[in-house]
Amino acid sequence: MQDKFRGQYRIPSARAQWWDYGWNGAYFITGCTKNKKHYFGSISNGEMRLSRTGVVADILWREIPHHARHISLGAFQLMPNHFHGILILHAPDGGDGDYSASDLPTAETGHALSLQPGKKRFRNQGKNTVSSIIGGYKAAVKKHANRLGFEFDWQTRFHDHIIRNRQAFDTISQYVLYNVQNWEKDCFYTPGDKSGFPFHT
């Protein structure tokens, strides 16, 4: 891709104080594992190979619309030690940014896995905000991975970027789609073991 996102695809870590994260719009989210450990799997021959913990994280991301109202999912990709995903909020009474969230396409990438819809796997979301949704997702992944006996923990914070227009949406979506192929150039890159398997289950 020709257009870079913020120069080196770096994402600000602090919430924007001037923005209500319950407003309608699209949000680019990045969450990292604790100490950048390869909990989610490994990349081999340009493909992401999910660990069992990665399968849990993949399934639960796709469950988000069952637990948070008026949410659609854009591009999503698990990497060995982090994930990238786009959340689209489109509540009928929500405020809008510079464009209408209903105009944006939705897309699912990566591993198409699913659970029985409607099962309550997340904590009560409370307000339909980015922080509550991602907080619920991260808590659910940790809870279910640990319950299954898999070592796992998150870095405390997550990174977000408010997507303000369609061009930015398309640029970021392409970055997510090609993230696996560009793994060794990624700012979160750390090497795996020589076998190509992840360090953790």
Regions found by a protein language model. Name each.
Residues 1-201:
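Short catalytic/metal-binding and nucleic-acid-binding patches
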